[in-house]
Amino acid sequence: MPAPKEVIEVASHEIAISNPDKVFFAERGFTKRDLVQYYLAVSEGALAGCRDRPGTLKRFPNGAAEAFFFQKRVPEHRPPWIETATVHFPSGREAAMLVMHDAAAIIWAINLGCIDLNPWPVRNTDLDHPDELRVDLDPGPGVAFDDVRRTALVVRDVLGDHGLAGYPKTSGSRGIHINVRIEPRWSFTQVRRAALAMSREVERRAPALCTTKWWKEERHGVFLDYNQNARDRTVASAYSVRPVPNARVSCPLDWDEVAAVEPDDLRLDTVPARLAERGDPGAGIDSAAFTLESLLELSERDEAGGLGDAPWPPHFAKQEGEPRRVRPSHARAGPDAREE
C-alpha cells in the first residue's frame, strides 16, 4: 500500500505530508504532523531567521534518533514554486540550494524529513557578502550551562563596545547563538576575521570561562567557534527544532532572559505558546544593519601585536597567513608533521 498522506494548504500552496503519524521524537511521542504544526505556528519567527537565504537540507527520514544526511542540492522533483539559488562552495563545486521564502517552503522541507533549518548567512540577492555575523558558543564536555550564559553576556558587552547589537537565542542543544545583522559589504573571509577578533576579545575578558582554541585537546570551558562564519558553514536558525530527545528549540531570547534561561523549558510543545504570549524577541533584527569596521580595526591591532590568523576547518584549502594546520599533540613530531 502507498504511504499515507495528508494534504494541507500553506501560503496558497497544497503540500502532501507523507507519513504524518511517523514518530520523530520517541521520548515525547512527537510525530511528523506535530513538527509540521509547530512550524506553522512559529513560521513568521522562523522566516526571520531563514527568509531569502539558501539553506542546506539536513534530513532525518526515520526521526531524530536515527541516521541523517545532508543534502545541499535541492531535489530535482520539486514544486514549481520552490525557489533556489546557485551557491559556490570552497571545493569549487556549485549547487542549486533551497531558498525559503515563505511558510510553504519551510513545510515542504519538513516533509522531506528536515527537523531544523540551516541557512547560510547571505541573502539570495548577494551570495558572496554575508549580512549576518554569527557567534556560536559551544561548551565542552562537562561545562555547566551557566558558563555559557556568562560568556554570552561578555559577548554582548564586547559587541556593544564596538557599536554592534546582537540577538541571542538558545542553540537548542547545549549552547547559545548570538546573531548580528551587518551590512553586506564584506566577504566571508573578512566576516570570519571580524568574528575571530571579537572572540579573542571575549577570551581576554573572561579567560577562565572561554577559549578560541581550535584544537579540542587545547580547549577548556566554552568554545567561541569563529569558523562558523566561514563560507559553507551553517547553524540552526531561529525557532528550529533540534534533533534531541525532548525536541528542544533554538529559541530567541531577550537579553534580560539570558542569565536564567533553561534550554529544556524551550521545546516543540512550549515555544508556540511563548511566542503567542510574549512576541518574538528576535523580531527587530532587521531594523538596523551594523558595520564591521571597529571589529576589523581590532583585528588589525591583534595582527600588529603578533596575533595572526587561526586554523580553518579541515575541508578548506590552506589560507594565506593561516598557521600550520597541525594539532598540538602531532606538532611535537616536528616540521614534517602532516597538516589536517
Region roles according to the model:
Residues 170-180:
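Short, conserved phosphate-binding/catalytic loop or strand-edge motifs used
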Residues 24, 64-67, 77, 143, ...:
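Flexible loop/turn segments at secondary-structure boundaries
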Residues 57-60, 166-172, 212-216:
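Short beta-strand
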Residues 2-11, 40-134, 138-141, 149-153, ...:
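SsDNA-processing nucleotidyl-transfer enzymes
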Residues 31, 126-129, 144-147, 151, ...:
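Secondary-structure capping and boundary motifs in well-ordered enzyme cores
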Residues 179-193:
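Catalytic palm subdomain of template-directed nucleic-acid polymerases
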Residues 1-29, 36, 47, 51, ...:
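C-terminal accessory nucleic-acid interaction domains of nucleic acid-metabolism proteins
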